[in-house]
Amino acid sequence: MAEFFPEIPKVQFEGKESTNPLAFKFYDPEEIIDGKPLKDHLKFSVAFWHTFVNEGRDPFGDPTADRPWNRYTDPMDKAFARVDALFEFCEKLNIEYFCFHDRDIAPEGKTLRETNKILDKVVERIKERMKDSNVKLLWGTANLFSHPRYMHGAATTCSADVFAYAAAQVKKALEITKELGGEGYVFWGGREGYETLLNTDLGFELENLARFLRMAVDYAKRIGFTGQFLIEPKPKEPTKHQYDFDVATAYAFLKSHGLDEYFKFNIEANHATLAGHTFQHELRMARILGKLGSIDANQGDLLLGWDTDQFPTNVYDTTLAMYEVIKAGGFTKGGLNFDAKVRRASYKVEDLFIGHIAGMDTFALGFKVAYKLVKDGVLDKFIEEKYRSFREGIGRDIVEGKVDFEKLEEYIIDKETIELPSGKQEYLESLINSYIVKTILELR
């Protein structure tokens, strides 16, 4: 089989002193940490849409990407070429997982029946390639946002026919995700929301969204799909106000409709910042709710108001992200999927590799720093001391439900002073910096 990236060698770990852009500096996939290889802690995944479908187009300019599969003019030939390129790409980067939307991997036909037949052919190609590879499917999903039929939404559309089409599309996407051994299935509601309340029945749309998700849960049970269902929150873009705004909003929705036991969250860094949160905030919320499922790894540009999907290169952010993952017990049916694209001017094939290497190194280093933070317990000790007043005396009585407003008033009414601990934010932020530097210095 012809190579798509003949000029790119298999990427190796060369250590922190390496200046080779096509080598890992911090990510050694076989390095054992806490009893298992680093690759199993991180579970890196390639996003099919950004890596093999994105062409560098933007609202102001034509495609710029120079991609070897673009020499194919027949849509099916191009689809098969992209699949073959995926496996070569993953194997050269030592990435064991990939994710896709149904419409990423196969073109649409004139009817859903025809589209499904086309999709089946591409799935067969993927299955054939899987036989000779260790590359696996992390999660699948359906594209319910690109086609004009979804202009009013999919599960929240005003058209019963569109609702039916979306349901049938998810049905098929669930089937192929199961067929390919996917560990999870993602629901992202890019068109599930509104532009204005003047033409929106908000209550009805939310009820229909719940009906849709309940149907998906029921169908997954009927076909024996045991993968993890994941909601991917995002506050806006492409829709002005999206119903899965953030973890707290989406969890409240799931809880109020009795769906919370079936779903966890796929947290994307750039979506968190669009919602006015830090990446760590969304991960922490998901963790304390017991709903941290998977991560879409990227970063945004805080000076811009849209989802830039850049490769993650901020070690401070990845440290705090992996801190939450480790505290949650690590990934089970989830991982780190690079929902990231090279910049429009980074148009060469090697840039695809360099971008992934940068992200993998950044998360590997972040994991190593976070592991030391968790192991040393420095943040836990500080937080424990900060809330010490609730482990003794009146604080303990509050926690144990032994007091009410009257008793608390009686306790406090004659106290002249209250002593408070310092938050020491500056110290803790500098402590993270120290751990990052210390970790780098200790690496070979």
From Swiss-Prot:
The keyword Isomerase applies. GO terms for biological process: D-xylose metabolic process. Its EC number is 5.3.1.5. Co(2+) 1 binds at residues 232, 268, 296, 339. Keywords: Carbohydrate metabolism, Cobalt, Cytoplasm, Isomerase, Metal-binding, Xylose metabolism. The active site is at residues 101, 104. NCBIfam families: PRK05474.1, xylose_isom_A. Optimum pH is 7.1. It is found in: Cytoplasm. Its cofactor is Co(2+). It catalyses: alpha-D-xylose = alpha-D-xylulofuranose. This is Xylose isomerase. Belongs to the xylose isomerase family. The lineage of its organism: Bacteria, Thermotogati, Thermotogota, Thermotogae, Thermotogales. Co(2+) 2 binds at residues 268, 271, 307, 309. Optimum temperature is above 95 degrees Celsius. Extremely thermostable. It comes from the Bacteria. GO terms for cellular component: cytoplasm. InterPro entries: Xyl_isomerase-like_sf, Xyl_isomerase-like_TIM-brl, Xylose_isom_bac, Xylose_isomerase.
